[in-house]
Amino acid sequence: MAGEFDFIEWVRRQTARRDEHVLVPPGDDLAVLKWPADDLLIVGVDQVLDGVHFDSAVHAPRDIGRKVMNRNLSDCAAMACLPAAAVATVALPKTRDIEYAKELFLGMKAAADVFDFPIVGGDTASWDAPLAMTVTILGRSSGIPPITRNTAKPGDSIYVTGPLGGSILGRHMTFIPRVREARQLAQSGLVTSMIDISDGLSRDLRHICRESGVGAALHSSEIPIHPDADTLSRQTCRYPIEHALHDGEDYELLFTTSAEQPYGYWIGMITAETSIIDEDGAISLEPKGWEHKL
């Protein structure tokens, strides 16, 4: 029966590529990275839990691994930074074997390979509980200042990068983080704030407004609705726009800008009043997206 050290040795073989920034790769107590003196280090962490973010009875382990890495990459996109390295932890149920752990890792690695950065370390344990995974990601600004959520200004336009709603039908596992799109937007110098839509448009817009001390006037008729929201609405008897506003896990970017943008969908304006209203008068904009109960 294979154990932890067999798995670690296998991971070392999977991460054997040479990277000029990695001075000490997986296998030691800590990874050692060389960091450019003129670059910012940007750090984020995210976790996924069986029964909350995925269902291990339904979703393949490689898809689960890909999702936990992509959630972190979506946070990189939200701040327009480039991923540079990651470390991961896996708390594996004792009912799962080393082959399952390998598939989880290969999913994480596949997501990292898309954006050409290494997994440089981590930790694995087994326990009598459901699968839990955590990834900590290290990002770099690479010449572009990070875009935050607290710098929206009255008069800014509000945009999203893609259609929303119904992600639970599958896109919450297969989404592609908008890292490249975020860099393109940031290079324009016109984006004033940004966030990824993980908790739902209504709640994530509220985050921007609260942190920036502003409000918003949305036009519900302009919000792009994904076909999945239409499909889901026939199952839930809710309007597609409700799914677009509140479902979450779309992982599109929600951003504000001081000028018209050729990329994305315009959905409203930032206002001085600290409230969020629907200018079309058709929907309630009370935040109903995801929030963990502590």
Where are these regions (language model features)?
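Extreme N-terminal cap/leader segments of soluble proteins
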Residues: M1-A60, M79, A88, E103, ...
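Glycine-rich anion-binding loops of enzyme active sites
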Residues: V11, V48, L82-I168
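General beta-strand structural signal in soluble alpha/beta enzymes
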Residues: L23-P25, I42-V45, P118-G122, V160-T161, ...
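Residue-level signal for inorganic ion chemistry
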Residues: V32, N72, A80, I119, ...
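Small-aliphatic-rich amphipathic alpha-helix that forms the alpha element of a beta-alpha
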Residues: P61-A85, L106-V114, Q184, L201-E211
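Active-site-proximal betaalpha loop/short-helix elements
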Residues: T95, M173-E249
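Short hydrophobic/aromatic beta-strand micro-patches
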Residues: L138-R140, L254-S258
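Acidic, Ser/Thr/Pro-rich beta/coil linker or hinge segments at domain junctions
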Residues: Y263-L294
